Structure formats: C-alpha cells, structure tokens
A protein has these predicted regions:
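Flexible, low-complexity linker/hinge segments
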Residues: 1-4, 119, 139-170
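AMP-binding/adenylate-forming catalytic core of the ANL superfamily
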Residues: 91, 97, 108-110, 263, ...
C-alpha cells in the first residue's frame, strides 16, 4: 500500500463527512461547509485540470490566503498527480518571478485581491499559461487567459477517482528564504506529507483529534501551514480558516465564536494577541493550546496566556526543509506533577525530537556538544519526511551532509536532551571574541511590563568589532527609556552582554512569514545610530 495524500481526505470524507470547515470571507461573513463538500469539490477540480493543459508531474502555483478554496487545492492538485506549489504572497515581485520561473509552474491559482502582483509581472513569467481566480467570477483585469474557479469546477466530476500514486511522487513544493541569493526550492513527496501528518497528530506532538477545532493563522503558503491542513483532514477536525489579512482582533473573535481548541501562529501574532486581549478580553475557555513559532516565544507571553486564560503555549522547532516539524516541547511525567506555571522554563525551549527524527548538535569542529546546557553548536537534523536536497540548486552541496540538513541554528542541549535555541548562526553577536545571544537579550527585554517587542542585532564597533544594539517597541503610553531598560537587564546578564544602544521605535520590520527581519535591521543599524546620536 502506497502512502498517499488522498488517504487523509478520504478518511475525513468517509467517517466525519458532516464536520465543518469555516472560512472568514472578505466582507467579514462566514462560509461554512463540510468535509463531504470539500471532497466533492476537490474531485471536481482534479477532473478539470487537463482542460487547462495541466497534467501529472506539472507544478501548479497557489497565491492565496487561508480559505476553503485553498484547502481544496491542497488535495485536488497532489491527488491528481500534480505538484502543489504554495507561493509566499508577501515576497517582492522579483522573487515571485524567480520562483515561478525556476519551478516552471504551468498555472497560478490566485485570490482576487492579489491579482495586481501578476498584472505587474505576467510578462516576465516564462511557463505560466493560465491564471485561475479563486472566486465566482473574473474581476476586471489586464491578465490574459484568466478563468474563474467556480466556472472551472462547475462541470467537474464530484466522484472523480484520485490516482493511486507511488508514494515518492512529488506532491508539494515550497521555497525557503536564503541568507544570500534567491529563495531555495523544497519538494515534498506524498510519503513525506503523510508521515509528517501522522507524526504531528501523535499525543506527545500536537495531539490533533477529531474533537478539535483548529485555527491555522500561520499562512497556508508557509511550510504547508505547519502541516495543520493535512492533520485536520486526517483526523476530521473542524477547521476555521481566517481568510485574508487576519489580525489579532479578527483572530480572537473567531477563536471565541467558533470555540477553537487549538491555534497556530507566528510569535509576532501572539504578541499582538496579548495586546488585544489586554484591551478587550475574550472568552477563550475552549482553548487547550496555542502553538507559536518562527522565533523564540518570550516567557512573558506564555505566562499571560497561562495565568489569564488557562492554556499553555506550545513551542516546536523545524523548517521548510523538515516539512516542517522536527522537535516539539515535551512535559514529562515528573514535571506534570508540578503547577503549570513551573512548566514555562521547559516550554520556552524547543523540545525534543519528534518520533523518527534524528538530531545532533555539533561544535565548529564537527564534534557533538556535551549535554550541559552551556556548550553551543549547530543543529543537524534528518527525518523520514524531510528533504535531502534543494530543487535544481547547487546550494544543496553546502546545505546537507550525510543526509542531515545543516540548519544554521545554534543550540545548547540540557542534560535530559531538550534543545535550547540560542540564535541563528548569522544572528549571534561576536563581541571581543565572545558570543552573545540576541534571543536571550530579546526575551529579557520583552519581559519588561512596558515592552511589547524587541530585536537585538550586532552594531559595528571599532574596539570590539560588534556590540549589541536593541530595537524596542513599547506598549502604548509607556515611559520606559534606555536607562531603565539597561537597569532591567543588569541583574540578568554579564555586563559585557548588555546592549550599548537602545532604540525606541514604532515597529520592527518583519519577513513575509512574520519573523523579525534581522537582515534588514543589520543593514540599517549604522544609519539608525547616526540619526539617533
């Protein structure tokens, strides 16, 4: 028996056909239908792909928000033998052009409000022949060869048989950002996605169940929304999809109204949720957990949700290359006997490897670091569901060693094997030959009651080569300044760790997936310091 994505959808359609999928529409209303409907519409679409000149093996791009139509594409495309290529809609035009040309996509399925991107770049796309607008009708557009999604599937076959595909058939594709150069492509097979899904649903991983109501805020264009759409279909869990441009008030209103039990979002969204809940509390009594990722979650955020709302924040670690999960927080039986607030020092860490994951932390000489929570090394990891190469990219040579992916993430390991992410290798600050963790400084700054968000980067220094510079976003009405921030940090760190500069700013730049954009901060820090002098 081959491991196929079709098995995930067929299970929910057969055994939980009436379970709901809810989508927030652009006008704020809610669209509701069921797994029975999802299955029929995905088959309708699969039966119509050939009419667009799309055949097994072709790459097909999506450029869309988290909606029911995008959810249908998650199954219709790979189950028809094509490759679901989710494209980050927040990328610069030149990166979108590069990605679509490099992957040789045959068509693009795009939400109506995102059409302007393709109106600007259509002339540069070499292989895209058709644009399918995810709507009832085609809006006014200058694009050629455009069809409306509902027109396309109207005459499709709701009982179209999905193919029995070899499990190593490519099923999905994402591009991951690169430290330098253009994004790198990662291919997922049916086997990869199936194994990752089953692992994610395990009790000691995310514990996804049919009784759950899931809200993936993490975009469906980013690492398969951390696998949650596939996990929901596998277990038949109710899905709540937040639609276009979700922000904290909308997310929290959905959590309250739909009785969400588990949600997943970037840490920056979690910080925004805290601020919104302080402004206007909600009833979140249905929640059993909130997964935050993309960067280290501040302990203060975890404490807020636990103390004020009674549910924990889950942490994990992974990447696009890992499909994406590789580790997950684990609260062992001894720790479970203690009050939940005492779990936070473990929850702020990145957990232990998921079943099936092999992970090692190596020093600069390629030797395993001791499990003393002090020695720092780079994480190397491999799983049965992770990639071993980049798509048509020579950077594979530097990115993988003996089947292990070189993550570029620096970590220490506790005596019981729990990862503590110290920093990205490129984000560590080397001052006078000694390493300083930007993550530790950021977490301490965010624990100040008047600080909403913080980022620490290296600023050039004539004597020490690099010194920490802190960018700080304060809470509304805050009066805290550099002197008080330094005093807040002094008891927590050695003197030479303390930032030399504290810049109070209105906002910190983010990447397309909500992470702090430290590359941008490093590029602007010298100018910012000159202007603040």
């Amino acid at each position: 028996m081959e491991l196929n994505i079709r098995l995930l959808l067929e299970r929910s359609a057969k055994y939980f056909p009436g379970n709901e999928i809810v989508t927030r529409l652009p006008d704020g209303s809610l669209h509701r239908y069921t797994y029975r409907d999802l299955d029929a519409r995905a088959r309708r679409l699969a039966s119509r792909l050939a009419s667009l000149g799309i055949h097994p093996g072709d790459r097909v791009a999506t450029f869309a928000w988290n909606t029911y139509r995008h959810f249908e594409l998650y199954f219709a495309l790979p189950c028809a033998g094509t490759v679901l290529h989710t494209v980050n809609l927040r990328l610069a035009d030149e990166h979108v052009v590069y990605i679509l040309n490099h992957s040789e996509d045959r068509a693009v399925f795009v939400d109506p409000d995102l059409l302007p991107t393709f109106e600007r770049i259509a002339g540069e796309l070499k292989t895209v022949k058709t644009f399918v607008v995810l709507a009832d009708r085609v809006p006014p557009t200058t694009l050629p060869n455009v069809v409306a999604y509902e027109d396309l599937i109207r005459d499709g076959d709701p009982e179209f048989p999905f193919q029995e595909l070899p499990e190593r058939t490519p099923a999905g594709m994402c591009y991951t950002s690169a430290t330098t150069g253009m994004p790198k492509g990662v291919i997922y097979t049916h086997r990869d996605i199936y194994l990752h899904t089953i692992t994610e649903c395990l009790g000691d991983v995310l514990d996804i169940r049919e009784r759950d109501t899931l809200l993936p805020v993490v975009p469906m264009f980013h690492a398969n929304a951390w696998g949650l759409p596939f996990a929901a279909a596998c277990m038949g869990a109710k899905m709540v999809l937040p639609g276009e441009r979700p922000h904290a008030p909308v997310i929290l209103d959905l959590m309250q109204a739909e009785r969400v039990t588990f949600a997943a979002a970037a840490v920056s969204i979690g910080i925004d949720m805290v601020a919104e809940l302080k402004r206007q509390p909600r009833d979140l009594s249905s929640m059993r957990g909130l997964m935050l990722g993309g960067s280290a979650t501040p302990a203060a955020v975890m404490e807020f949700f636990l103390k004020d709302y009674g549910f924990p924040v889950l942490t994990a670690w992974g990447s696009t290359e890992m499909t994406p999960l590789a580790t997950c927080v684990h609260i062992g039986r001894e720790l479970l006997q203690k009050p939940a607030i005492e779990h936070i020092p473990t929850r702020v860490r990145q957990g232990i490897p998921c079943p099936g994951t092999e992970l090692k932390v190596l020093d600069e000489h390629g030797r395993p670091v001791p499990w003393d929570d002090q020695a720092i090394g780079e994480i190397y990891v491999r799983t049965p569901w992770s990639t071993t190469e980049y798509y048509r990219d020579e950077r594979t040579r530097d990115g993988f060693v003996d089947g292990y992916w070189k993550s570029g993430d620096m970590s220490a390991v506790s005596p019981d094997g729990v990862l503590r992410l110290v920093d990205r290798a490129k984000d560590l600050i080397k001052s006078g030959g000694e390493w300083i963790s930007s993550v530790d400084l950021e977490n301490a700054l965010v624990s100040h009651p008047q600080v909403r968000e913080a980022a620490v980067v290296a600023a050039p220094d004539d004597k020490w080569l690099e010194r920490p510079c802190a960018y700080v976003v304060t809470e509304p009405g805050a009066t805290v300044g550099p002197a008080e921030l330094r005093a807040w940090l002094e008891p927590k760190f050695a003197k030479w760790w303390l930032p030399d500069h504290y810049l109070i700013v209105d906002a910190i730049p983010k990447t397309g997936v909500g992470k702090i954009n430290k590359r941008a901060l490093r590029e602007q820090v010298e100018q910012d310091l000159r202007q603040s002098a």
